[in-house]
Amino acid sequence: MFALFLQRGMNMRVKDIINILDAEVICRDDLLDTEVQTACGSDMMSDVLAFVKEQAVLLTGLVNPQVVRTAEMMDMHCIVFVRGKRPSIEIIHLAEDRDMVMLATKMEMFTSCGRLYDAGLRGGSGR
């Protein structure tokens, strides 16, 4: 169904995630060629901080400034809001200032993570 990037020896790019998740770009459409190697899906930012290493994409239904701050601390390049969630303009500006792409999809978390996994994107190692 989806291209298997890892089998072809290619990294996925943010623009590929947009197609896979039928997502809308919220901010930083100038960074859509950014490569991503791993992903994490969680609504608990404490879990992201405790168990995630070197992730590139964060999928979440949580919409508050803590999401951007957590993503920044974990050196993530892209935040995907699931279940049709939309951040406020203040949160969007926070991400823009930190060079983070924000996307939104109507898909649920489980479906979004599954589609990205099917396309070859994997989760990172836990501590």
Where are these regions (language model features)?
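Short secondary-structure junctions
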Residues: 23-29, 123-124
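Short, structural beta-strand-to-alpha-helix junction motif
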Residues: 13-15, 108
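Generic low-complexity, intrinsically disordered sequence content enriched
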Residues: 8-10, 25, 98
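Feature captures the catalytic cores and cofactor-binding loops of soluble hydro-lyases/lyases
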Residues: 33-34, 38, 42-57, 61-127
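Short secondary-structure boundary micro-motifs
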Residues: 9, 27, 32-34
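Short, Lys/Arg-enriched N-terminal segments with co-localized hydrophobic residues
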Residues: 1-11
